[in-house]
Amino acid sequence: MDMKLLAAGIAVLAGIGAGIGIGIATAGALEATARQPEASDKIQSLFIMGAGLSEATAIYGLVVSIILLFVA
């Protein structure tokens, strides 16, 4: 097996962490909205910002894996 493929596969694992993180954050946001519906606007904006930051790690992993496959 080529080491580039192994390294790219390991870099893609960042997507798993991002998926788990966004899932946990979504569950927390839904629970918080259910407890305090009047604060749903603030909860939603904070959730979207946090989900974007969490998704950035998955995008970085994808970029690294593409670089490893095609450049390295």
Curated annotation (Swiss-Prot):
Membrane topology: Multi-pass membrane protein
Spans through the membrane: 5-25, 51-71
InterPro entries (alphabetical): ATP_synth_csu_bac/chlpt, ATP_synth_F0_csu, ATP_synth_F0_csu_DDCD_BS, ATP_synth_F0_csu_sf, ATPase_proteolipid_c-like_dom, F/V-ATP_Csub_sf
Localization (cell): Cell membrane
Keywords noted in UniProt: ATP synthesis, Cell membrane, CF(0), Hydrogen ion transport, Ion transport, Lipid-binding, Membrane, Transmembrane, Transmembrane helix, Transport
Keyword Ribonucleoprotein: no
PROSITE patterns xref list: ATPASE_C
Pfam families in the record: ATP-synt_C
UniProt subunit comment: F-type ATPases have 2 components, F(1) - the catalytic core - and F(0) - the membrane proton channel. F(1) has five subunits: alpha(3), beta(3), gamma(1), delta(1), epsilon(1). F(0) has three main subunits: a(1), b(2) and c(10-14). The alpha and beta chains form an alternating ring which encloses part of the gamma chain. F(1) is attached to F(0) by a central stalk formed by the gamma and epsilon chains, while a peripheral stalk is formed by the delta and b chains.
HAMAP family according to UniProt: ATP_synth_c_bact
Protein family per UniProt: Belongs to the ATPase C chain family.
Protein name (database record): ATP synthase subunit c
Gene: atpE
